[in-house]
Amino acid sequence: LMAGTTNAPSAYDPVTQPELAKNRMDWVLTKMLEEKFITKAQYDQAVATPIASMLHVSESPAGCGAAGSAAYFCSYVVNEVLSSENFGPDVASRRQLLTRGGLKITTTLNLQRQSAADNVIQSNVPTGDASGTDTTIASIEPGTGRIQALAQNSNYGDGGPDSSDTQLVYAADAKHGGIELSDGTVGFQPGSTFKALILAEWFKEGNSAGAGLSAVPRTFQWNIPCAPENNDPTWAPKNVDPSLNRSTNVTEATKMSINVAYAEMLSRMDVCAVTNFASSIGVTKADGTPLDARPSIVLGSQNVPPLSMANAYATFASGGKYCK
């Protein structure tokens, strides 16, 4: 059967063309008998064997699904090609080039880091976890901006009957397959990881790590010249742990991630300067404009792609070198 299909695999495919495949197989067996490679008994037995009994067909994942744990990294690369005018004037021509153009694509995937990222996810919030929590890990090399791993707790698929199937790339922006929400934002709330950007602007404005702060919950006056309508004097953030409602300093506030202390830091700065700084290292809205300048930004309340936050931290790790 296999020998008969090699001349024209599609034409003699035993799954889609069983009759043609059987005729071809019988022809091969006849030639083998003539050349005395098999006996008449072996010939009769083989010819009498139905094609269906020889097949054990199992579905193999196609496209990026065949990349295993790196399927979403693969999808990111595919979306990069399909969204870039460098590869054609429209999506159809880019897809044609991608599938039939003989492109040789070299990626930045680090298999060791990809495996480590996937192992961490599956060990903590695995695919199909009862909590329903979506989890993703993105790894970027500081100084180069190279994406080295993208992992998430879902199966790569078209969102069929299995609720864990999706082709959305949780870590990415909309252009690369990320989750674009109805309000025009993409990704997830970064939460307290955004405090690092507040701290960077704090130092940029000449403030010190030893500056005293009060972490006692209260309201603040905000400096938001680019969006004065967002100045909410009634907003009063709270600390997760009431024992932190006390005097502190910037160093301890960072170490303990104290919400109210960081709110005081933000109140001493221009909130617009913080969003502009965030934009300078790639943390923006889906359309590339700065995040909304509002007090709650100190708690990471606005959705951003995890890859953007990973790249922001890579900028810190590289000594301030931001790579798009």
Map each language-model feature to its residues.
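Non-catalytic, structured segments within soluble enzyme domains
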Residues: 1-108, 115, 284, 290, ...
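Short pre-catalytic segments that frame enzyme active sites
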Residues: 10-14, 49, 95-101, 111, ...
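Extracytoplasmic/secreted proteins, especially bacterial periplasmic and envelope-associated proteins
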Residues: 1, 20-33, 45, 68, ...
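Helix N-cap / loop-to-helix initiation motif
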Residues: 38-39, 110, 270, 305
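Sequence contexts marking disulfide-bonded cysteines in secreted/extracellular proteins
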Residues: 63-65, 73-75, 225-227, 271, ...
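Structured alpha-helical segments in the cores of large, soluble enzyme domains
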Residues: 81-89, 270-279
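Generic structural signal for hydrophobic core residues of well-folded globular domains
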Residues: 3-9, 36, 81, 201-202, ...
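Thr-Gly-centered strand-to-loop micro-motif
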Residues: 264-265, 299
